[in-house]
Amino acid sequence: MMESANAILDQRQNCGVRKVLHIDCDCFFAAVEMRERPELRERPIAIGGSSDRRGVIATCNYPARTFGVRSAMATATALRLCPDLVLVPSNMALYREVSQQLMAILSDYSTQLEQVSVDEAFLELGRDEHASSVAEGIRQRVRNELGITVSIGVATNKFLAKVASDWNKPDGQFVIRPNEIADFMTTLPVRRIPGVGPALQKRLELAGIITCGDAQTWSLMELVRRFGRSGASLYQRSRGYDSRPIHTERVRKSLSIEHTFAHDLPNPGACLAQVSELYERWLTRVSRTPWKAESLAPFVKVKFADFTQTTVADIGESASEEGFKRLLQQALTRADKPVRLLGIGGKFPHTSEQQLSLF
């Protein structure tokens, strides 16, 4: 705990020194498709699988969002909300090409560049550079050279910059200046903190924590006792603290997705029936990274009703739907019990750095 307190003190002392930009493409996949097919610009479109294959929406444009369509939504649900929705097959080769062009533009402004995903990056500038002007220049270049738009947040650290980039979407920028952090954080809803999902948000609401200002009334010890590691992170983020550096060669170890079922799955057949939907959701997440699904070493995680769990991995297996099913069958032979949670994922090759995760 003393180490955490010292880290927070260091962040207070260093606050205002750094100039960090978070660059986030606006509905990237859809934007690239609209660039290629201008006739789609005014129509609601989504990148995703067909409804008869239990597909999942990877992203959609803003006209589609007015109907309630969202990323990670089942395609069948999206079509019910918007019957005129145009489904466009993904073109990952093209998206990666545009992503590389984007990173090339960003690298012109600083060597301190961290690519977070295919459509997102952090950039740190020198102390003497005018961050707002740089952000405006980047947005103009991306618009003119790539035919898409980005939104940019500017702040003293990565967390605040990421929050800021979502403030004036699309094709906008927002600056959180050092002397504005305290007031800004007081009114910021905790749900706007990256990593606070619906489950944690509900727990926080039950504790009376709606805004970051509410969280600031809790001591570090109280938050840790109530929320564990999430409480320690919340203590720092609710005050706008984040000492993470820019990782110029950031490498993830793995990418996975899990689902806890409202009712335990009673048998292997019921478990195997869930793989298709999990796989589609996992592919959506993989598509937002620079990697291809087939290059990942697959693994399956099973948590049984009694909270025991097992993981099966096989570097010789393919990271395909059928490959995950075969691994799941192996895992289920290890215990004859109902299942409460299933997870699938893939390990990236030759990685050693831990994933960065807030919660």
How should each PLM-predicted stretch be described?
Residues 1-226, 232, 343, 350-355, ...:
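Gly/Gly-Pro- and Ser/Thr-rich, intrinsically disordered tail segments characteristic of DNA damage-repair
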Residues 205-341, 350-355:
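DNA-contacting surface of Y-family translesion DNA polymerases
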